[in-house]
Amino acid sequence: MVDKKSPLIAVSVGEASGDLLGAHLIRAIRKRCPQARFVGIGGELMKAEGFESLYDQERLAVRGFAEVVRRLPEILRIRRGLVRDLLSLKPDVFVGIDAPDFNLGVAERLKRSGIPTVHYVSPSVWAWRRERVGKIVHQVNRVLCLFPMEPQLYLDAGGRAEFVGHPMAQLMPLEDDRETARKTLGVDAGIPVFALLPGSRVSEIDYMAPVFFQTALLLLERYPAARFLLPAATEATKRRLAEVLQRPEFAGLPLTVIDRQSETVCRAADAVLVTSGTATLEVALCKRPMVISYKISPLTYAYVKRKIKVPHVGLPNILLGKEAVPELLQSEAKPEKLAAALADWYEHPDKVAALQQDFRALHLLLKKDTADLAARAVLEEAGC
């Protein structure tokens, strides 16, 4: 029988964006149930909320098919260990946050043993591999969706799902304040500033950081007073960035690596170069023009290209239903093209103003009390 005062809630996340969602979820659950206990796999932000992580979350932060194949034995070992540990601990509910290829397998095994399961952040079934919907309905009791077009797919398949809004839209202010952001970071108000967001995973840094830094050098030729800001999500990414920056060709690049503070960095920027993923939505909610880029192994790219069912990869473009911002991917992700696209935003404020109106409408659409809605659903599944 569930102890309604101190339920044991298992949570598993695979990367930095999931760690942030997990931290907010823990905080929201504690408001409703102060004695709740949390265990599973989490990152630094979740640990700061009192979460007990049984395995290193960084070991799951891999990108793309080819990268997963190389690390598959270790990932499967961690998953088997987590299932074994949770079957022993018998949590009142399991919440898998994103990382569906890892978490849904855990959820399915726990659900068969009678443990209620929730998947928080629907996989992009509306974009590719839509056949997964029926399987997901079988694997979990409930899906918590961040985007409004997602729940109906699960409802049509006989599952339970709801739109809880996107946490960033709820947490981030609707209005823009570049001046305050620049003051916070100690950046001159009158100079060109570009933010570089190469990704939160070490594997993304390996692919994207050299290209982004080469792009910055080209922008510096065009705007000699420019400065570049880069928020590092974790200590692991910070260490890898430092290694890349030690290369001779990047000596003298006026780039500041900042601990986290990605929102402040984006608000301080005139334009943002960002790797496709959750970060693109954060940039949009900051009302900043961006150029979206992505490079992955040829094997992964060939697989994804065959499967994808939508014309865009960037979340802002998908949600707005048009290419509102440029996407330069794979062979198109060349420093010369990226620099030209960023310069186009910097030199055309009228285009930026129109884009900001689109981003404001998107912000209003996604704005809900996400963490509280998710907490309510999780506690309901736990019987609290």
From Swiss-Prot:
| Family per similarity comment | Belongs to the LpxB family.
Q: Which SUPFAM superfamilies match?
A: UDP-Glycosyltransferase/glycogen phosphorylase
Keywords (alphabetical) are:
Glycosyltransferase, Lipid A biosynthesis, Lipid biosynthesis, Lipid metabolism, Transferase
Q: Any idea of its EC number?
A: 2.4.1.182
Q: Which reaction does it catalyse?
A: a lipid X + a UDP-2-N,3-O-bis[(3R)-3-hydroxyacyl]-alpha-D-glucosamine = a lipid A disaccharide + UDP + H(+)
Keyword Glycosyltransferase attributed? yes
Q: What's one GO BP annotation on this UniProt entry? A: lipid A biosynthetic process
Q: Short name of one Pfam family for this protein?
A: LpxB
Q: A Gene Ontology molecular-function term?
A: lipid-A-disaccharide synthase activity
Task: Spell out the coiled coil positions from the record.
Answer: none
Q: Kindly provide the name given to this protein in its UniProt entry.
A: Lipid-A-disaccharide synthase
Q: Which gene produces this protein?
A: lpxB
Pathway field of the UniProt record reads: Bacterial outer membrane biogenesis; LPS lipid A biosynthesis
Q: Which GO terms describe its cellular component?
A: membrane
What this protein is reported to do is described as:
Condensation of UDP-2,3-diacylglucosamine and 2,3-diacylglucosamine-1-phosphate to form lipid A disaccharide, a precursor of lipid A, a phosphorylated glycolipid that anchors the lipopolysaccharide to the outer membrane of the cell.
